[in-house]
Amino acid sequence: MCDDEETTALVCDNGSGLVKAGFAGDDAPRAVFPSIVGRPRHQGVMVGMGQKDSYVGDEAQSKRGILTLKYPIEHGIITNWDDMEKIWHHTFYNELRVAPEEHPTLLTEAPLNPKANREKMTQIMFETFNVPAMYVAIQAVLSLYASGRTTGIVLDSGDGVTHNVPIYEGYALPHAIMRLDLAGRDLTDYLMKILTERGYSFVTTAEREIVRDIKEKLCYVALDFENEMATAASSSSLEKSYELPDGQVITIGNERFRCPETLFQPSFIGMESAGIHETTYNSIMKCDIDIRKDLYANNVLSGGTTMYPGIADRMQKEITALAPSTMKIKIIAPPERKYSVWIGGSILASLSTFQQMWITKQEYDEAGPSIVHRKCF
């Protein structure tokens, strides 16, 4: 299947924040770009400027001053199909430079994705892009595959949504899946807010990107939040400086760990919800008593919002406190977890045993979009 690039399968992981796309069998995605579509706010004044009616990804990001930006994927679920089509078109033709009608395509979906959504994805792939075959896989399951496991519980936290997904022998257990609408975007917003309290002003979408960069470079998770706050108050050992694009240097202290602490204490941003350690525990407790031991011993972190230094140690500490005292608890935090969904897709689509799993164009023509529920589960 993968001996030549002519028929190699494509793998496209559509996240709320970033699209990750590339070829099955590769060890990393070729294209990673923001999941945004921008449209000009005003009609172009200058004739012949070749102004397009829409821009996708990095180009939309760089022209954001004159555009209205929209994210077609909210909280992991596709909500705007016209814009989503534009993103897929951009992925195939501009980023990967392939003809989709020549490549089987593996797409990813959020856990508990509505049935109508899976059908719509299937329909667009076959009818708009004429793919020869396609498959839809649950993101968390792919992350687990990427870590070399088939049983475990995945904490997948990206830009738009966080899920706890217990998986047994390769199958997600839907009754025990937890969803938390708190993820990277909310943490960036929270960091903007607490930096404003320090006297720095960040308001525009352009400034938000700067804050996201500060977050990614300087934030970390404290092992003991109260202790860390005390240390930050009594000395400057935790302070770091960051140079803004205009050359101004700002200093940030306790904000570095107050920002991601929100994952463990959602009340920081006014959310009445359990933290990620409690949702993990609750998810395990909804599973059959016989498999809990396997889940506790295989806690896999996945997604960009699990990239904070210190998060694995903190999860270990918090879950140990909740679980039975004799239980062996292990947190697995692979270094490439930012892309582990994509990597899992790349592994899956290049397995010889997977080749019979594809939904083919012929099967689609015979059965229609609902075929996806029979073949992808």
Swiss-Prot record:
The keyword Acetylation applies. The modification N-acetylaspartate is found at D3. InterPro entries: Actin, Actin/actin-like_CS, Actin_CS, ATPase_NBD. Oxidation of Met-46 and Met-49 by MICALs (mical1, mical2 or mical3) to form methionine sulfoxide promotes actin filament depolymerization. Mical1 and mical2 produce the (R)-S-oxide form. The (R)-S-oxide form is reverted by msrb1 and msrb2, which promote actin repolymerization. One of its GO terms (molecular function) is ATP binding. Its EC number is 3.6.4.-. It catalyses: ATP + H2O = ADP + phosphate + H(+). PROSITE patterns: ACTINS_1 (PS00406), ACTINS_2 (PS00432), ACTINS_ACT_LIKE (PS01132). Shows a different expression pattern to Xenopus laevis act2. Expressed in stage 24 and 42 embryos as well as in adult heart, but not adult skeletal muscle. It holds the Pfam family Actin. SMART domains: ACTIN. Residues 1-2 form a propeptide. One of its GO terms (cellular component) is lamellipodium. The modification Methionine (R)-sulfoxide is found at M46, M49. The modification Tele-methylhistidine is found at H75. Belongs to the actin family. Actins are highly conserved proteins that are involved in various types of cell motility. Polymerization of globular actin (G-actin) leads to a structural filament (F-actin) in the form of a two-stranded helix. Each actin can bind to 4 others. This is Actin, alpha cardiac muscle 2. The lineage of its organism: Eukaryota, Metazoa, Chordata, Craniata, Vertebrata.
